[in-house]
């Protein structure tokens, strides 16, 4: 049994121009690759004549019928558009008249519950892969107050999902509602079509895999008789539980056993080796990460120490007119190492004293 599909989107004033161009096929360049323009003449509007220009005519209908004299907010939802359809197999069982009746029946359900005049368009597209209807409803309540949030609240949507399939079924269409799922996400048209293409791809891969499995099974069936060829044997005279075979057959059996054992051993060896390599790689990545973090920590520490040494050097120079030994600055990375001739033993002793005792005051 097929499913009745009903999905709603909210349209504001800024959306109506683009939606109108799409629904009424007013442009020749379509972003939707599923549209077959050679079949666009088969499209029809079940409430033809109510809306020619989506934005202008729908805004005019709202202004003429709303109870309040205040202007409609710019960000208000003006239309709740419902896309009504089912699956392709369902429509393939219907002729054109039955297909039209399916959409008329669905439209009548909404007319009975939300007002026929509030349905400003009900465009059926027959030029795409699966027939479907775009039906725009102005969300007026009984007091002619515009409120999409109140008219199509969560409770109302649940009623529609329950009642519409039953209504269609009572009118002769073999459909059922989809599975209940509170966490189900409503997909946009591009998302839905992308998912549909992904499903087609998966189905193709499934068929290819099944074909490969069938081919592999056929090859195994052909190999099996050859691998299990009958070896001429005869029981020994002294022991019926033992048989004798020709030397050539025995050698063939031994060779097969050796080959099989070697293959299995090599396979296991490679699997163990791969597992070991994966472990080594994982450990190396972990160690590399730890080293990077340690290097970052040390670099920060070096930067801090360099700052302290630089401040001390500047303080001594400013207050006492002296500086830290150049050797200290070189070791701290604050000065390039000097390239001087080898120092005398006295100078070496002096530098050693500097390193141990600090600057001479």
Swiss-Prot record:
Span list, region Disordered: 331-361
Domain of life of the source: Bacteria
GO BP annotations listed: DNA recombination
rRNA processing keyword on record: no
Matching CDD domains: MobM_relaxase
Entry keywords, A to Z: DNA-binding, Plasmid
Keyword match DNA-binding: yes
MF term (GO), any: DNA binding
InterPro entries linked: Mob_Pre (IPR001668)
Positions with a binding annotation for DNA: 44, 114
A Pfam family it matches: Mob_Pre
Stated role: The interaction of the RSA site and the pre protein may not only serve a function in plasmid maintenance, but also contribute to the distribution of small antibiotic resistance plasmids among Gram-positive bacteria.
Extra information: Contains conserved positively charged amino acids probably involved in the binding of the pre protein to the RSA site.
Family from the record: Belongs to the plasmid mobilization pre family.
Name of this chain's protein: Plasmid recombination enzyme
Organism: Lactiplantibacillus plantarum
